[in-house]
Each structure stands twice: as structure tokens, then as C-alpha cells.
Amino acid sequence: MNFVIATRRSKLAQVQTEIIIDLLNKKHDIECEKLLIETVGDKILEVSLDKIGGKGLFVKDIEVAMLEQRADAAVHSMKDVPYEMPKGFEIIAIPEREDVRDAFISLDNIKFKDLRKGAKIGTSSRRRAAQLKLLRPDLDIVPIRGNVQTRIEKIKKENLDGIILAVAGLKRVNLDHLITDYFDTKEMVPAIGQGALGIEVMEEHPKKELFKDLDHYNSKICVLAERAFMRELDGDCHSTIGAYASIKDNIMHIIGIFERKNKIIKKEITGTKDQYEKLGIALAEHILKD
């Protein structure tokens, strides 16, 4: 059996797809090949995502490949997948999640707490920028886009003191040795779905059940809880929003942030994990009452 899996052209996207292919090979005797697609989001790098249509730009061209039957499935970073799926598509599986934290990288190995006053920090994320300003109001936030390697190179090129990147991506491309500091998930609440990969298929695909074996239940319901929080707040790349759900002894804890009326609101909620979607919605409602 031959499967074609669509993904973006970046090194990270290809590595993430190879992770899924390896998992498939362990579960089933399946031959897989990658279909590399340059998405609109990959082509336009000089403009921030919220000005050109959001993170869905990394997904739409790949969905077209599935519609045209050039691909059987797609692998995405779940943080790039809009909460509203197009008709006829679904996320069939979310494998075990990687480290959800954000990392600080400084080429001179200067710790975040030791940064000079007015230090220039590169990030294109509204969520990261807002939380950086809460931690250090004096910081100068510089927008940067591009793949992981490009952003790291921009530290020198743009004379930055450091940048913020997701730990998961750095680990997957074997660059986590560059990390200077790890942010705790309470001081820097991650993006919705950060660290998780999602396998997208068309609902009518005859072999879609093969992917279900790759699902990691706790990882999936944590991401779904975060996405319920985002959906209730109608969050997207125009929003300053983040959430992280974790499970211990069947109890789910979610921390979320959202910018409302020019104020960053942070709330937490705890409940049984079988109520994951209701917990995400309830957390959003708490924030809206603030």
C-alpha cells in the first residue's frame, strides 16, 4: 500500500512528516512518500501573518492537494491549524505531544534575566510579544519571520539580543543545544496546540482509519480543550491568545491568556479530563467575565 503525505517544504515540516511516516511504518506495512508544497504563508515572509490572512495560509494549499487527490493525508503543526476545519476535512489523529514550552536563544549565551535594559528580542508572535512585555516592559520587540534556521541567523543579521522559538521545533531539527533559557508555561503560556502534530485527512478517505492507531488520547484531548478555548473566544492570529492543557491522574488543568480591552487576562481551570471540551469553554467564559 502506498500513501502520499503532503507537507510544507521547510526542514522542520519535513522532519515532522518523517516522524509520522516512521510511526506508520511501525504500526502498518505502508510505503509512504512526501508531497512537498510551498504554501502562501511560506512565500510571503516580509509581512506579518495577521496582515495576510493568518496561520491558515500554511494549511490551505495542502488541503487543495488532498481535494485534488494528489495526497492522502497531511501533517501539520497543530498550532497552525485554524479551529474551524473546512467542510469534508478532519484531524484524524494527534500523536504524543512534544515539549510545549517556548525557548529563549541568545548567541552570546546571556540568560533572559540578565538581558540589558531595552534589549532587542525577535518574535513575530503577538502572544509571545505580549507576555515578554509583561515580564520585561523595557524590551524592544522586533518582528521576524522565516523558518527556524532563518530566525536564528537573524540574531546576528538584525543585531538582536535574542529570539523566542518553540522548544518542540528546535528539538525536532536538533538545534535545542542552542537554547539559553526555557520559559515556564505559567510565565509564557504556549500557543494553542504548540508541540503537537496533527494528521489531516478527508472525511471520506477509505483508508483514514489506519491513522487512528497513531492517536495519543491524552495529547489529543489536551489539544482539543485548548482549541475549544480558542473557538469560544474566536481566537486567531489577530488575537493575543494562548492556552496549555495538561493531565495528571485523570485531572485536567488548563491555563489560558487572552487580550481583552487592551489588557492581558490570565486564568486557570481544573476538572476531570472527560470534560475536556467543557473545561476549555468554561475557561474562555471566565476570561470574558473579567
Swiss-Prot record:
Q: Name one GO biological process term.
A: protoporphyrinogen IX biosynthetic process
The pathway where this protein functions is:
Porphyrin-containing compound metabolism; protoporphyrin-IX biosynthesis; coproporphyrinogen-III from 5-aminolevulinate: step 2/4
Keyword check for Transferase:
yes
Q: Which UniProt keywords apply?
A: Porphyrin biosynthesis, Transferase
Q: Which domain of life is it from?
A: Bacteria
From which residue to which does the signal peptide run? none
* Catalytic activity line of the entry: 4 porphobilinogen + H2O = hydroxymethylbilane + 4 NH4(+)
Q: What is this protein called?
A: Porphobilinogen deaminase
- What is the source species? Clostridium botulinum (strain Okra / Type B1)
